[in-house]
Regions:
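Glycine-rich, positively charged N-terminal anion/phosphate-binding segment
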Residues: 5-12, 16, 27-101
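Conserved, mostly hydrophobic/aromatic
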Residues: 24, 39, 78, 105, ...
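Glycine-rich beta-to-alpha transition loops that act as phosphate-gripper elements at the mouths
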Residues: 29, 149-152, 216-227, 249-251
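Catalytic cores of alpha/beta
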Residues: 90-94, 160-164, 223-243
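Alpha/beta enzyme core
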Residues: 93-103, 135-211
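Glycine-rich phosphate-binding active-site loops on the catalytic face of alpha/beta enzymes
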Residues: 240-258
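C-terminal helical cap(s) of enzyme catalytic domains, especially alpha/beta-barrels
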Residues: 254-269
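Conserved small/polar residues in nucleotide/adenosyl-binding loops
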Residues: 295-302
Length: 312
């Protein structure tokens, strides 16, 4: 990567900020409806993503339970898992009444279960199919259709591989790419290990922005603080800046960092809710919507008091 900065460029300002300036990643068993309600209490501007929802679940399951997005104001994206263009188009149409601002195709999950369904990271090995999926989804909605992907698959981790993948999908009309800056290893690593073992190569995001200047490029991968987000957004390489940053585990491990997003990244006033008030609001939301469920998802509220003087 060329580290020569271009002094004439200025940092992103709120008036010109990309809609994808700050995003919270789709995370299985985490970013369900109560979690997104919780996140929205902390940031008005951040873009929130659902858990991945498969096309089969939407066709055969309870759509209100899977897609309900009530009381989660602000920009929210539905992430879909699938590889059949017709089924993805059906899922997009079925989700239309629920008010999502974006439909995202998962091309990054490496889990064996997802691979058996022929979607997730293994889709990167068939860029033409991904392009067909994107075209079908775009034909079914006027909302943005985006793709979240890795920078490589197994031994295919050279820049040319991800560049050609993005190029094929770009030609299908996709203009926003969320780049998880690690390769996916489809054999031999667990999903958790796939988030930690493959080398982090953030430079790929700037290389893609250089080669696809009209695309929105969002960097995902081990981003932990709003200060780090700000620094990454201000970095200039090869004369370009990336358009956005996506955080993952930090959003539930140290969720109070989300309360800094609007001020640090958008120049707006901070939230005034206390941690205790946020916890009370989330508990009321969970009681209202999930009192009848027979399972309990892990809650990001568990991290609200982390790093406080009285916390362990």
């Amino acid at each position: 990567m060329n580290d020569n900065a271009t002094p004439s460029l200025t940092p992103n300002t709120p008036s010109e900020a990309s809609p994808w300036l700050f995003c919270v990643a789709p995370m299985l068993d985490w970013t369900d409806r109560p979690c997104r309600f919780f996140e929205r209490l902390l940031t008005r501007r951040g873009r929130l993503y659902t858990e991945m929802v498969t096309t089969g679940a939407i066709r055969f399951g309870s759509r209100d339970a899977l897609l309900g997005n009530s009381r989660v104001a602000g920009p929210t994206a539905l992430q879909l898992g699938g590889s059949d263009p017709k089924e993805l188009a059906f899922a997009v149409e079925a989700a239309a009444p629920y008010g999502y601002d974006e439909f995202n195709l998962n091309c990054g999950c490496p889990s064996p279960r997802v691979q058996k369904g022929s979607f997730g990271a293994c889709l990167m090995l068939d860029a033409k199919l991904v392009a067909e999926c994107v075209r079908a989804m775009r034909d079914a909605t006027d909302k943005p259709v985006t793709v979240k992907h890795r920078i490589g698959v197994d031994e295919r981790s050279d820049y040319g591989f991800v560049r050609d993948f993005v190029g094929e999908v770009y030609d299908a009309g996709c203009r926003t790419f969320i780049v998880h800056a690690r390769a996916a290893w489809l054999q031999g690593l667990s999903p958790k290990e796939n988030r930690e073992v493959p080398p982090l190569m953030r430079s790929r995001a700037w290389e893609l922005k250089r080669d696809f200047p009209d695309a929105v490029i969002v960097l995902n991968g081990a981003v932990k603080t709003t200060a780090e987000c700000r620094a990454l957004l201000d970095e200039v390489h090869d004369g370009v800046r990336i358009d956005g940053v996506m955080v993952g585990r930090a959003a539930y491990q140290t969720p109070w960092m989300l309360s800094e997003v609007d001020s640090v990244l958008y120049g707006e006033s901070c939230r005034t809710l206390t941690r205790e008030a946020v916890i009370a609001a989330v508990e009321a939301e969970v009681e209202q919507y999930y009192a009848c469920l027979l399972y309990t998802s892990p809650s990001p509220r568990d991290g609200l008091l982390s790093r406080m003087p009285s916390s362990a």
